[in-house]
């Protein structure tokens, strides 16, 4: 693949975190680096193990493949390969691949002299994943509390965890996470729609300027966060959506063991409600 006109001057040595110049090269448009190699290794090994696990189950139906965590009786110990050990190895591979990918992003940022906003944003998603399969099981004393790798089995796990706390949507951190996901979608959909409407004119028309974009939102809601501000806002919303997702699950079990509706009893017990007001004169 041919380089774009400006790419060659940015393809310089240096900026690596590990390995020096050993893996400091590109394959086509893709920068490799040491962490590109480790990403490929972990991703390939994890994928092969998933398919091997599927072969042991006798199905390659993507809906039915299920790589389950060990039984709770194994606690935090190692399980036999076909009794949860495979899940443990695949979890290591997935974690290694995700972290390697983030560190590869760091190396690219260092080469270009950019900030680390992209790897930090990706780190929020990694933390959410690790909370589900590492941090929460550690706090609850068994790897069996992690979620299985499979489409239907994963959905069953989500349903079972929800019912274990009666109504999971009463979890206040879950409320925040869902709100942030929807708000992120709304903010970036509005932003994307605005840019397309301003910068993708019909044939023969001129593209509009950022002043048009700012004026639209001032007319629309009375305020414009600005062309840079909308990206800061979207970044903040998206990161918080991932982090509050991690918080909502890690407090379910290690911190709060009852049904989530019971958590709201503090609201009913607040003194502001007081005693019922007596009716005067039968009115």
UniProtKB/Swiss-Prot annotation:
Annotated binding of a ubiquinone, by residue: 217
Keyword Kinase among UniProt keywords: no
PROSITE patterns the record matches: REACTION_CENTER (PS00244)
Entry's Gene Ontology molecular function annotations: bacteriochlorophyll binding; electron transporter, transferring electrons within the cyclic electron transport pathway of photosynthesis activity; metal ion binding
Key words of the record: Bacteriochlorophyll, Chlorophyll, Chromophore, Electron transport, Iron, Magnesium, Membrane, Metal-binding, Photosynthesis, Reaction center, Transmembrane, Transmembrane helix, Transport
Bilayer topology term: Multi-pass membrane protein
UniProt: Fe cation binding residues: 191, 231
Residue ranges of coiled coil: none
InterPro entries linked to this entry: Photo_II_D1/D2_sf (IPR036854), Photo_RC_L (IPR005871), Photo_RC_L/M (IPR000484), Photo_RC_L/M_CS (IPR055265)
Chief localisation class: membrane
Pfam assignment, any one: Photo_RC
GO BP terms: photosynthetic electron transport in photosystem II
Cellular-component GO terms for this entry: plasma membrane light-harvesting complex; plasma membrane-derived chromatophore membrane
Subcellular location: Cellular chromatophore membrane
Assembly with partners or alone: Reaction center is composed of four bacteriochlorophylls, two bacteriopheophytins, two ubiquinones, one iron, and three highly hydrophobic polypeptide chains (designated L, M, and H).
Family: Belongs to the reaction center PufL/M/PsbA/D family.
Matches recorded under NCBIfam families: pufL (TIGR01157)
Protein name stated in the entry: Reaction center protein L chain
